[in-house]
Amino acid sequence: MEPPEGAGTGEIVKEAEVPQAALGVPAQGTGDNGHTPVEEEVGGIPVPAPGLLQVTERRQPLSSVSSLEVHFDLLDLTELTDMSDQELAEVFADSDDENLNTESPAGLHPLPRAGYLRSPSWTRTRAEQSHEKQPLGDPERQATVLDTFLTVERPQED
């Protein structure tokens, strides 16, 4: 009698078993309270075994962050920020004043700010509008303004 297909007598199926300790996974029942084994410690930061986490690049933090002060690009965030909130406006103004004081040359004093921030898009919009502005005395502009007012008026009721 022949064996069923796919199960030859000379074939031995063997799976390669990798010890769990090599993968960084503790064996069950070893009394290791579920903590991941630490392979090394670099700069005070524990690095887990390579089977769980592979660190390809290591870099230093860009800057330290305190609980009260976070540095980010203010110009991008001012469009999304409600500047009518007085406390928030003061925080932005304070951080902007600090930047001006550190960047100004000795002997020169920065001009006081009015308490608002400008973003590049606001500046661009104002610059574009100033190119498009026509003097108020221009008859063409006055006709446009009058047409606008005439179309907005309510019809008189009889």
Curated annotation (Swiss-Prot):
Positions with biased composition (Basic and acidic residues): 125-141
InterPro entries assigned to the protein according to its UniProt record, in alphabetical order: Dysbindin (IPR007531)
Modified residues (Phosphoserine): S95, S119
Coiled-coil intervals, chain numbering: none
Gene Ontology terms: biological process: regulation of signal transduction
UniProt GO cellular component terms: cytoplasm
Annotated spans, Disordered: 1-50, 93-158
Keyword entries, A-Z: Phosphoprotein
Domain of life: Eukaryota
Family from the record: Belongs to the dysbindin family.
Name of the protein this chain belongs to: Dysbindin domain-containing protein 1
Lineage: Eukaryota, Metazoa, Chordata, Craniata, Vertebrata
